[in-house]
Amino acid sequence: MKAPYFWSADLDPKSREAAPLTRLLLTPFAMLYLWALRRKLAKARPEAAPVPVVCIGNLTAGGAGKTPVTEAIRNRIRSAGLRAASLSRGHGGAEPGPLKVDPARHTSRDVGDEPLLLAGSGEAWIGRKRPEAARAMAADGAEIILMDDGHQNPSLKKDLTLIVIDAGAPFGNGHVLPKGPLREKVPEGLARADAVILMGAGPVPPEVTASSLPVLRARLAPLAAPPPGPLVAFAGIGRPQKFFDSLAQAGGNVSDAVPFGDHHPYTKGDVQFLRSLAHDHGARLITTTKDHVRLPLDAQSEILAWPVTAVFEDTAALDAVLAPIFKRAGKP
């Protein structure tokens, strides 16, 4: 779904745009959601995996950059000589898992967009039952499991928890779902974490400073310059505007931009609409790599994908955070 406009932090809470009546009506649902999450976390008995588990999660609904961060950390672990694999729930996919994702056989409708994207550059698994999936991964030879987006899932014991926060839009309006974008109260989420990865430019949020957690700075960097000529950009991610702005700032000639809801399953009708829009502008279509894998197969060859990667400012600091995991996995 598209993030409601009133989730934004840049609004006067009493203004019409901030939808004070809507927020008031959603307050009981936010309280119920928070009560259910706290109860689930309190009653949980996490199962230990046969190998170390690194959780890469966040505190908001989408848009923080977990997937490229997961890919970058997986690459860092692999460069140390260890076999690392990502584990996702497989949101939006029909397969329950445990399943090793194969880009040659699976589509986003099978396994979800993020696992399919991660499988394009390394080993990726899905599993709705995380402990069962972790056992299957270890039996297959994985030495370290990167649990993509599992901070609010207590079923699997984590050896290290990293929270990804978008420095440009850390916590939205500060309210919990559905009143705001937060999956839980910020201090409670940070209390279960070991470090914070702050994505992009912006100050360290006061809540993070108060937590005394180590902060790793990272940013998204394009792997290639935007293609020349006019472009019609579209995206169905947590913060589509972030993609549009990045594309323009990198020199892309963005004639028009179309936001879709997060994890939007593109249809032939969507593609036809986008083709028509591009034709009107005399432009080519371009989207994120995550959106590209959700396109109908017959449309993927004609639509451009603009790849980005997560770059850590201080890789030595990242290695220091990962050191206990390396040690447990048998790599001094």
Swiss-Prot record:
Pathway: Glycolipid biosynthesis; lipid IV(A) biosynthesis; lipid IV(A) from (3R)-3-hydroxytetradecanoyl-[acyl-carrier-protein] and UDP-N-acetyl-alpha-D-glucosamine: step 6/6. ATP binds at T60, A61, G62, G63, A64, G65, K66, T67. GO terms for biological process: lipid A biosynthetic process; lipopolysaccharide core region biosynthetic process. It comes from Hyphomonas neptunium (strain ATCC 15444). Transfers the gamma-phosphate of ATP to the 4'-position of a tetraacyldisaccharide 1-phosphate intermediate (termed DS-1-P) to form tetraacyldisaccharide 1,4'-bis-phosphate (lipid IVA). It is an enzyme of class 2 (transferase). This is Tetraacyldisaccharide 4'-kinase. Transmembrane segments: none annotated. Belongs to the LpxK family. It catalyses: a lipid A disaccharide + ATP = a lipid IVA + ADP + H(+). GO terms for cellular component: plasma membrane. Residues 84-113 are annotated as: Disordered. Residues 102-112 have a biased composition (Basic and acidic residues). HAMAP family: LpxK. Keywords: ATP-binding, Kinase, Lipid A biosynthesis, Lipid biosynthesis, Lipid metabolism, Nucleotide-binding, Transferase. Its EC number is 2.7.1.130. GO terms for molecular function: ATP binding; tetraacyldisaccharide 4'-kinase activity.
